[in-house]
Amino acid sequence: MGLLDSEPGSVLNAMSTAFNDTVEFYRWTWTIADKRVADWPLMQSPWPTISISTLYLLFVWLGPKWMKDREPFQMRLVLIIYNFGMVLLNLFIFRELFMGSYNAGYSYICQSVDYSNDVNEVRIAGALWWYFVSKGVEYLDTVFFILRKKNNQVSFLHVYHHCTMFTLWWIGIKWVAGGQAFFGAQMNSFIHVIMYSYYGLTAFGPWIQKYLWWKRYLTMLQLVQFHVTIGHTALSLYTDCPFPKWMHWALIAYAISFIFLFLNFYTRTYNEPKQSKTGKTATNGISSNGVNKSEKALENGKPQKNGKPKGE
C-alpha cells in the first residue's frame, strides 16, 4: 500500500515522528560540539553564517540587475589592497597551523581531535576559525566582479566554491576544530597565498600582466590539492584513523565535486580552441580579480563615474 493509500492519521503520525526525530538529532549534535569554540564570534548559532551566505546569493542575483545600466566601478587601489591583505591573512593562517601542529606533534597521516585547552590545540582551533572567517571575506571576490560588471566571471563554479566553503567550514569548526582538519586548511591557505599574490599583481594593470604567464598552473595546483585531499582522507579511512568518519566521507565527496568542476573549467579555458579577441570569453574558476586591458583603456580615456547611471 502506497503513501497515498494510507490513512490520514498514520501519515500525520509518520510526519510528526520524522520531525521530532530530526529535532532530537539536532539537539544531540549540539551536545557533542566543540565547547572551546561555543562563545567565539559566529559560532553560537548557524544563523549568522546562513544569513551572510543568503545575502551573498541575493547579491549574486540582484547585483547584476542593479549594475545593468550603470558604469562599472574602477577599483584598482581597492583590489590591490584587498588581494595583498588576503595574502597576509592566508600567510598568517598557514603559519599558525604549521607552528601549532608542529609544536603539538601532529601526524600528517592520522591525527585525532584533541578537545583539550592545551595551548597548541587552542592555537590550531583559532587558526581554523580564522580560516573559516577568511572564506566569508572571500565573498568580496564576487562583489568586486559584479561591481566591475565582470558578470561572466561569476560562474557556477565560482559561486559554488565560495558559498559552500564558508557554510561547510562553520560545521567543521563547530565539531572538529583540530585533528585531521588542519591538513586541508593548511594546504589550502598556502595555495591561496600564491593565488592572491597573482591577483594582487594582476591588479596593477597590463604592464605586469604579460609577466604572469603561470596562471594556468594555479588551476593545476588546485587540482593537485583536491587529489591530495582524497588520497590523504582515503589513507586515514584505510588506517582506521580515530577522526569522525562522516567528515572523512564528506571531504572525499566535496573534493570529487571540485575535481569535476575544475577539470571542466581547465578544459574549456586551456584545451579548447581560442576565440577571437573580440569574442573572447573571460575565464572563471581562479580567474583574476585584477584589472584588465579594457579597464586600463577606460581609465586613460574619458573618466567614468563609479556606479553612476549611464549618461550622467
From Swiss-Prot:
Reported impact of residue 162 to Q: Loss of fatty acid elongase activity
Disordered: annotated segments: 273-312
Source organism, top-level taxon: Eukaryota
Listed pathway(s): Lipid metabolism; fatty acid biosynthesis
Tissue localization of expression: Expressed in the retina, exclusively in photoreceptor cells and in the brain, skin, testis and lens.
PTM summary: N-glycosylated.
Mutant lacking the gene: phenotype: Rod or cone-specific conditional knockout of Elovl4 results in a decrease in very long chain (C30-C34) polyunsaturated fatty acids in the retina, but has no effect on photoreceptors survival, phototransduction, synaptic transmission or visual behavior.
Primary location: endoplasmic reticulum
UniProt subunit comment: Oligomer.
PANTHER family assigned: ELONGATION OF VERY LONG CHAIN FATTY ACIDS PROTEIN 4, FATTY ACID ACYL TRANSFERASE-RELATED
Listed name of the protein: Very long chain fatty acid elongase 4
Native source organism of the sequence: Mus musculus
Gene name as annotated: Elovl4
